[in-house]
Amino acid sequence: MALNDFHVSEPYTLGIELEMQVINPPGYDLSQDSSTLIDAVKPQLTAGEIKHDITESMLEMATGVCRDIDQAAAQLSAMQHVILQAASEHHLGICGGGTHPFQKWQRQEVCDNERYQRTLENFGYLIQQATVFGQHVHVGCANGDDAIYLLHGLSHFVPHFIALSAASPYMQGSDTRFACARLNIFSAFPDNGPMPWVSNWQEFAGLFRRLSYTTMIDSIKDLHWDIRPSPAFGTVEVRVMDTPLTLDHAINMAGLIQATAHWLLTERPFKPQEQDYLLYKFNRFQACRYGLEGVLTDAYTGDRRRLADDTLRLLDNVTPSARKLGADSAIDALRLQVKKGGNEAQYMREFIADGGSLIGLVQKHCEIWAGQ
């Protein structure tokens, strides 16, 4: 199967996708009513898109192409308002978080959608288990070779993005001991983790052609790598973040990725090599397991450093780019988060340690998303 040509897009433009939980009070389990909400809100949208994801308990908010984080925030805020209004009318709740803390995957209904039904046929129960919730950020690129360079550059910071956004410590009613348990769900998929090594767009087209021989890959959307090029949009898409509990944090994460992309493509601080990925999964695991307390290991020198310290270094490196893009408020907020030493997974555990229940935790998440 041939790959679409890489669509030229304005560099550093943004697109944000948020996979939201549809909740059924008063038990605060996942609902199976996303279709009802989507039908209710679609006529009210003036920008962006609200659509299905894999199962009926998931609802995806997606911006259009945005110049900066302020425009993205305005679009997401407008969508948030109409979704919350419709959810209230249908006695449902909406919240973020990378996993629902006590839902049972066996109860999840795959959407009546040709692509998702085909995916269910290919992957069986793994698709129902993939009822987890992430944030994806698209960044515009001028051409395919820039996209491949950017993908490799951003891959250096996958642990940083995971640790900052980690919001999935609970699954199936248990504390997983992970800050981000969501990504573990995808470990059984054949396309889990980093994209196989290529050095340019021509090589990527050849890789895609060979992957399509498996009959499991019809389009780029069927590849679930941590970061992937999206030729139809002319973007690189970062897919490792948990859906945050607040819109503000989602915007901050998008601002960081936009600023990092600008820094990478203007400064070209790395010469990508296949060996860069030698310890990729080990460092990724550290971020998932321990969050900002994880330890990174350099694939070339063996040097080890705290993820929190390296994240502060990244924030310093991208600050000039953030100023040029109007994303400096995002970098300031994330720097404060790192210095305080926390993420949303830590907040969730503190809520439970203070005597809260998992039901109460989901209720609190719905209140947070609604701004209460």
UniProtKB/Swiss-Prot annotation:
It holds the Pfam family GCS2. Keywords: ATP-binding, Ligase, Nucleotide-binding. It catalyses: L-cysteine + L-glutamate + ATP = gamma-L-glutamyl-L-cysteine + ADP + phosphate + H(+). GO terms for biological process: modified amino acid biosynthetic process. GO terms for molecular function: ATP binding; glutamate-cysteine ligase activity. Its EC number is 6.3.2.2. Belongs to the glutamate--cysteine ligase type 2 family. YbdK subfamily. NCBIfam families: gshA_cyan_rel, PRK13516.1. ATP-dependent carboxylate-amine ligase which exhibits weak glutamate--cysteine ligase activity. This is Putative glutamate--cysteine ligase 2.
